Structure formats: C-alpha cells, structure tokens
C-alpha cells in the first residue's frame, strides 16, 4: 500500500494539470509553430516555464486504484498486476480468464 501522502500528491498534480491544460496547450502550440516569429516562440517558452511544474501532464504517474502502487499498472484496468491477478482468479473482473493453450 502506497503512503497516503504520495497518492494525495498525484491527485494534486491531476488537478493542477486540468486547471492549466488549456493554457499549457496554447503555449505549447505557439512554441512549436515554425511559422511564428522567434520572439513569439521565445515568449511562449518563457510562459511555459512560468507555469507551475506540476501543471505539466508528463509529471503524472499512473497508480493502482486500490493499492496506489506506481509500477506495473495496467491502463486498461487501472490496477496493478498483482491486484489484477487476485481479482481475475476470484472472478471479479468480467471477461478475464486464465490463459490456456
């Protein structure tokens, strides 16, 4: 089980990223647009640097919904591999069966 503080930190990052998503996308588009002048692009880069560090969506980490484990998390289920195994064997995940070939 992950510490509560780490899970709360991730939730805080999600909220910040959602809050600044439009501004971040706008500045990112300007900074990467080759048709814009160098001054505009530089101003956009400076604007990106002034945003909070945690507003960047790449700083978010996928965590297991149950345990909070940051590694071995499957996006499709939102669960860590160990929890997927437990729940699949218990029959709690519909459509998931043990492989046999």
Swiss-Prot record:
PANTHER family found in the cross-reference section: 30S RIBOSOMAL PROTEIN S14, SMALL RIBOSOMAL SUBUNIT PROTEIN US14M
So what family is this one in? Belongs to the universal ribosomal protein uS14 family.
Q: Which HAMAP family match?
A: Ribosomal_uS14_1
Q: A GO CC term? A: small ribosomal subunit
Q: Which Pfam families does this UniProt record tie to the protein?
A: Ribosomal_S14
Species for this entry? Paracidovorax citrulli (strain AAC00-1)
User: Which regions are flagged for Basic and acidic residues bias?
Assistant: 33-44
Its subunit composition reads:
Part of the 30S ribosomal subunit. Contacts proteins S3 and S10.
Q: Which GO terms describe its biological process?
A: translation
- Task performed by this protein: Binds 16S rRNA, required for the assembly of 30S particles and may also be responsible for determining the conformation of the 16S rRNA at the A site.
Q: What is the lineage of its organism?
A: Bacteria, Pseudomonadati, Pseudomonadota, Betaproteobacteria, Burkholderiales
Spell out the residue ranges making up region: Disordered.
32-67
One GO MF annotation is: structural constituent of ribosome
- Alphabetized UniProt keyword annotations: Ribonucleoprotein, Ribosomal protein, RNA-binding, rRNA-binding
Name this protein carries in UniProt: Small ribosomal subunit protein uS14
């Amino acid at each position: 089980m992950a510490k509560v503080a780490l899970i709360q930190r991730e939730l805080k990052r999600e909220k910040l990223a959602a809050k600044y998503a439009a501004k971040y996308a706008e500045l990112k588009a300007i900074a990467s647009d080759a048709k814009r002048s160098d001054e505009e692009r530089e101003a956009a880069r400076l604007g990106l640097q002034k945003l909070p560090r945690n507003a960047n969506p790449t700083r978010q980490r996928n965590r297991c919904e149950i345990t909070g484990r940051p590694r071995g998390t499957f996006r499709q289920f939102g669960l860590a591999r160990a929890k997927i195994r437990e729940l699949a064997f218990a029959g709690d995940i519909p459509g998931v069966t043990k492989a046999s070939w």
